[in-house]
Amino acid sequence: MHLAGAVNRIRKFDGPVRVYVENRARPDRGAQVSQVVEDIRARIQHLDITMTENAAEANVVVTLVRDRDLPRAINKIYGPDRAQLIQRSLVPQCLASFRKDESFRITRSDVIVVADAGDFIFYDCVYEELLQALGPINDTSLVPWTMFNDNVQMGFFDIYDQYILNVLYDPRVQPGMDSDEVRAVLPQIMPTVRAWVARINDLDQ
């Protein structure tokens, strides 16, 4: 699940991304979040993302909670009015949101993940919500092979989504661009992205 308002411009981080885990759950899955962040770092060519142990340095905060404590965590992060709306319209096990400035640069993302719902759901949630927190937050049911389709559960960072994130974080795609501006630069971007994704996944080009 995502919370970011209308989607009509490119939103992305325009600098280093530092991820902090606030653990309120058992089992403690902080090490697994670190593994996911490292995997994302290795697969997105132009993204500087890593963990931090200093909450003040973080611009992405991942809150791990028990399933029974999820409503309380949503209320704390989003406030009572918005929390009621979230819980009335959805039954989330994980969610992400971000704030952006007037130039559509993401300034902070918040991710909430249930830690005690099993390994597969945990990894599926962490990958999906962390990646959505980086900007591609428009869920769609039209494409069957992406984790950004809420009807699909993967639990890993698949090839198609690697294309999406590598296009988004190519330096030629700037915060605030509209769809026409992005389409105009795609012919220059795609050969680089295809070569990168093929190389890191040992694919034949």
Regions found by a protein language model. Give the residues of each.
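Surface-exposed acidic, glycine-flexible loop patches that form ligand/cofactor-binding
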Residues: 8-11, 52
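Acidic/histidine-rich, surface-exposed loop or edge segments in extracytoplasmic proteins
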Residues: 10-25
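Metalloprotease/metallohydrolase-associated module, dominated by Zn2+-dependent proteases
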Residues: 1-7, 80-121, 137-205
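Metzincin-family zinc-dependent endopeptidase catalytic domain
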Residues: 27-143
